[in-house]
């Protein structure tokens, strides 16, 4: 990634070590003070990390989704994160593997760890009831209609240029927003299991 640096990386990995084992508990047990404390520290570290490195594709895509469909920024990030990770993972397997280790996963190779992390984040989104765009109430026809514009708006933000795999507008529409049949079915399911493509 263009803006990655050792300072931001250390903060991001520390945040993952805190958030990974505590997010579900903080979500399910709002009075769990230890989990909430870990989440506050992890969230602060994550914020410091991206403040010192910038953001990438998922944030760039979340802005137009929020503008067009009135989805809160954090929620739209969560909705898209598995799809963005699947799109990006092949361009930075060692970095994803570092994140997987920080998250508490183990594996035989960087590639296996990177894929395990994508699966773990998909499961996390399911466990936390992160809705698909359709479950949130977004009309598929309107989503498809606005996908090219949202892709252009994301690119104009500059954020996708920081992604490990830098997309063009067509790749955002096809590879992240899931419009075309050229991407694998797992990505479609990760983006929105309720939509038939």
For each predicted feature, which ranges?
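Alpha-helix C-capping/helix-to-loop hinge sites
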Residues: 1-2, 26, 46, 68, ...
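Alpha-helix N-cap/helix-start motif at coil-to-helix transitions, marked by capping-box chemistry
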Residues: 6-17, 55, 75, 90-93, ...
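Predominant activation on well-ordered alpha-helical scaffold segments within soluble catalytic domains
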Residues: 13-24, 40-44, 58, 62, ...
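C-terminal charged capping/lid subdomain of soluble metabolic enzymes
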Residues: 106-197
């Amino acid at each position: 990634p263009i803006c990655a640096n050792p300072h931001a990386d250390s903060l991001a990995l520390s945040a993952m070590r805190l958030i990974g084992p505590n997010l579900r508990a903080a979500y399910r047990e709002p009075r769990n003070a230890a989990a909430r404390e870990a989440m506050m520290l992890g969230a602060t570290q994550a914020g410091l990390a991206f403040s010192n490195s910038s953001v990438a594709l998922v944030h760039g895509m979340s802005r137009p989704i929020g503008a067009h469909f009135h989805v809160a920024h954090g929620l739209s990030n969560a909705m898209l994160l598995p799809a963005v990770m699947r799109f990006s993972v092949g361009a930075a397997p060692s970095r994803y593997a570092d994140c997987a280790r920080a998250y508490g996963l183990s594996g035989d190779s960087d590639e296996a760890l990177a894929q395990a992390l994508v699966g773990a984040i998909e499961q996390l989104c399911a466990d936390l009831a992160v809705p698909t765009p359709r479950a949130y109430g977004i009309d598929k026809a309107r989503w498809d209609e606005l996908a090219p514009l949202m892709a252009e708006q994301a690119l104009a933000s500059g954020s996708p240029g920081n992604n490990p795999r830098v997309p063009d507008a067509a790749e955002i529409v096809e590879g992240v927003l899931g419009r075309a049949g050229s991407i694998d079915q797992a990505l479609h399911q990760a983006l929105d299991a309720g939509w038939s493509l």
